[in-house]
């Protein structure tokens, strides 16, 4: 794969709605090019006989069983709330 161009960096920045300067675009072009070049080195590895994996370790589901449990009583929760009304925690408005 060829190195990434400055136009590609600017295009990705535009898609991500990032305002970048010319200096930043040049820096990111160099940095991304180095990253791509480093990743391309993986193509040179001999993977003959290596089975594809999705995890480095042979792990199964390590999560605990999901069991429903009783929560705190509403009264105890409201004791910790700075403001409440009608059994609901009141928070500052986030919409105008």
Swiss-Prot record:
The reaction(s) catalysed by this protein are: L-glutamyl-tRNA(Gln) + L-glutamine + ATP + H2O = L-glutaminyl-tRNA(Gln) + L-glutamate + ADP + phosphate + H(+); L-aspartyl-tRNA(Asn) + L-glutamine + ATP + H2O = L-asparaginyl-tRNA(Asn) + L-glutamate + ADP + phosphate + 2 H(+)
**Key words of the record:** ATP-binding, Ligase, Nucleotide-binding, Protein biosynthesis
One biological process GO term for this chain? regulation of translational fidelity
Supply the EC number(s): 6.3.5.-
Query: Molecular function (GO) terms listed?
Result: asparaginyl-tRNA synthase (glutamine-hydrolyzing) activity; ATP binding; glutaminyl-tRNA synthase (glutamine-hydrolyzing) activity
Which class of enzymes does this protein belong to? ligase
InterPro entries xrefs: Asp/Glu-ADT_sf_sub_c, GatC
Q: Which residues form a coiled coil?
A: none
Question: Which Gene3D superfamilies would you find in this protein's record?
Answer: Glu-tRNAGln amidotransferase C subunit, N-terminal domain
* Record bears the keyword Ligase: yes
Q: Name one Pfam family in it.
A: GatC
Report the function annotation for this chain.
Answer: Allows the formation of correctly charged Asn-tRNA(Asn) or Gln-tRNA(Gln) through the transamidation of misacylated Asp-tRNA(Asn) or Glu-tRNA(Gln) in organisms which lack either or both of asparaginyl-tRNA or glutaminyl-tRNA synthetases. The reaction takes place in the presence of glutamine and ATP through an activated phospho-Asp-tRNA(Asn) or phospho-Glu-tRNA(Gln).
Q: How does it assemble?
A: Heterotrimer of A, B and C subunits.
Q: Please state which protein family the record places this protein in.
A: Belongs to the GatC family.
Protein name, please? Glutamyl-tRNA(Gln) amidotransferase subunit C
- Tell me the lineage of the source organism: Bacteria, Bacillati, Bacillota, Bacilli, Bacillales
């Amino acid at each position: 794969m060829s190195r990434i161009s400055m136009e590609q960096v600017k295009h990705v920045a535009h898609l991500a709605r990032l305002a970048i300067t010319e200096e930043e675009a040049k820096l990111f072009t160099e940095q991304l090019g180095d990253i791509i070049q480093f990743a391309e080195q993986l193509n040179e590895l001999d993977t003959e006989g290596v089975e594809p994996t999705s995890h480095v370790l042979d792990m199964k589901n390590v999560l605990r069983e999901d069991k429903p449990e009783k929560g705190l009583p509403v009264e105890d929760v409201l004791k910790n709330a700075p403001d409440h009304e009608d059994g609901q925690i009141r928070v500052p408005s986030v919409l105008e």
